[in-house]
Amino acid sequence: MNIDKDVNYFTRGNASRKDMLKDKKQQYKNKVLTLILYFVILCMFAIITILTINKIGNYPWGSETFGYLYKGNILYDSFINGESFISYDINWYNGTQLLKGSEPIPYYLLALINLLTNDIYVTFSVFITLVFIVGGTGFLLWGYYCNRFKLGLFFGILWFFIPNNLRVLFSEGNLQLVIINALIPYLLLIYYKATRENKFKNYVFLSVIICIISLNSMHIVIMILLALFLLAVFDTIRKTYFGKKFFIVLLSLLGILLSAFWLVPALGEGLLNSNKSEVIQKLTQNSYSLLDSISPVLRFYNVEVYYFGLSFFLVGIFSVLFMNGRRDIKNLSFYGILIFIGTSNVFIKVLKNIPFSEFLIFSKVTSIAIALILVSILLWRNLRKVLIVIICFILLSDSMLTFDLIGHNREFPEGLVYSLDYASEIATQRIGILDLSQYGALPSYYLKYGVKGKSSNQVFGWQWKSANTSENIVMINTALENNYYLVMFDRCIQLGADTLLIKKDLINDFNYLDECANPNGYIKVYEDTNDIIYKYPIEGTFGTTVKFDGIAIGKYAENICYSFPNFTKGDKDYIDDYTVSELSEFKAIFLSGFKYRDKKKAEDMLKEISEKGIRVVVDSNELGDEEFLGISSKKIDLEDNYGEFYFKGERVKIGDFPEDEKIFRCSYLLGGKDDNNNYINVDTRMLEYMKYYNENLVFLGLNIPYFEMITKDDVALEILEEATNMESYILPDRKCVNIQIDFESNRIMVNSENNDVIVPIAALSSFETIEGSYQVFNNLVNLKSKELVIE
């Protein structure tokens, strides 16, 4: 045996292993240095981009941007005062819990940046720069993982310029979604690694990033988890890593649990409360056909149009058709295309029949679809370089066209700001901006932080659904949109708005607007090409006393208040939650979409009230088959119009249904006494729409209150006047009275010479009464003592 030879063999083997380890360390070092170099390049592009964005000015123009900046700025003010949370803000919506039911990360991030900049506009520029760098770094890490640094850098830079990402940032101004879009490359990378590596750290990172996304938007994280779940299901069919992927999706739920410290209280405050019909209606209005969504032309006519990107769609189709080898990589592009299909208007029609469809908004996860397509290109190892160059060129060209259209901030908006300055100068209590949100969130921000030397409280704000006065806001906006100016002015006075700024292009009849303003006490004091300003001539803070002759009870009862301003919407939808004495204070009671806890008690109450000479009208559209006082209703769909219509025994001409409701769903009446005076003829059938239980208790069918509200039909209005025994377009007896309102730390102190004054402060459920007493009236504080202290 040659010992020297064996020793040399093992020596050479050890040396070889050492060289291999040394080479691996050197390769790792080179990769890290390359990553750092490319990160520096990415940061340079981010700086150049923000300078380009601010070339004209540094004022954002997105419809929601200033709402985020407002909350970030007011949270910054709290930091300066040594507090880390906003419990109450008096400026918006007659007082609101500003972060109630809101995810916190966007506002805290803006506030923290503002601690460094002390300028909210510079803060927004820093925010954009960070979004560019964070999102781009995600693709740099993909390049590191795939060992394709140059392509990773290109996609990292491109990610900011994706048409959908630009629209969300600049046009929508949805900073929650902007942050989430920046995190999507990390989410997909960690998810992809977790399915292929049995490393605990991947599961931890995935839970952490889901937690961060949850604290940005709970609605979006639901869609993201659904997207990951469907991807796992799709791969199950293809038999690639299906068991592990399901397990990983389940582990992702831990991320939501990590955010429970904030989200659990927020859920109790309505974080996930969504009106399904409203969401589906909005989705239908803002959805497009698949061809329109990839049309590169439409964005030139409307910068807010949803554009997936023709180039990204074609690249996705290309990779699905021509990628050879690993099927799981091809699946990424295929699944991205499926998400895109989920955004189409055809799919929305199917979606509305699915349970919880209000959460299935695929357009919100468009960036996931695009990221999946980009990742599939990164993982496509045998793709020729010339094809990579062509793909990069068409993606960049498509994206830069959108950037040229919307990728900019603007100059100081002097025209609107002049009107806001004037309104703030003359306002003594609150300003109402009646613009149907067309001015975006800018007025809400500017009236707090923009007017020099003065901060003006407002009736409106931003994200009205979280406001305690949301029902009041909806009624005023509906009145403005449908030209019910009389009730609009009256309800603005009730909310304490002594100054109103109205956007002129929302007004159809300026003479009628003035005619409705005068009896409410408003005087026109300013007008330019865009706005009109009305002022109520009163100094100091004030409340109102009011006497309504009618009360509307139920989910849909408010419809009657537009033509009958003398009706007030009841604060409770259950009839038997009221007392007979409470309801006996009114001359008429209108019920629509009402409820009851005890049917017999409710019936007895209405009989007793009607026997006192008080008119009771029951809108039977939601009554259904269950009899109420012996009367029920049956659904029917009518087309174009009511047909032969008889009122008081005579045939009358009633108007057609609106264009968007040509198929009109309503109900006719069954049971009770035959009337034979108020009916329609349908297919030789006589269908009654008005029945009297007794002289003062009337049942009304055919959805006439709603029909009258949307059409202002004269015959329908006459029927309502007959049924309610009330005259239309009569204001309630309202008077303004001066009161003293003081805010001190977390206390609100009210002093009045009168009791029963409606104070224009939203009655929050979190209020605690320290001194005095109050009740809730139309979501406002109704003073029941001359002094009131709440905190």
Language-model-detected regions and their locations in the chain:
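Membrane-embedded transmembrane-helix bundle of lipid-linked glycan/lipid transferases
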Residues: 4-411, 415-422, 427, 484-486, ...
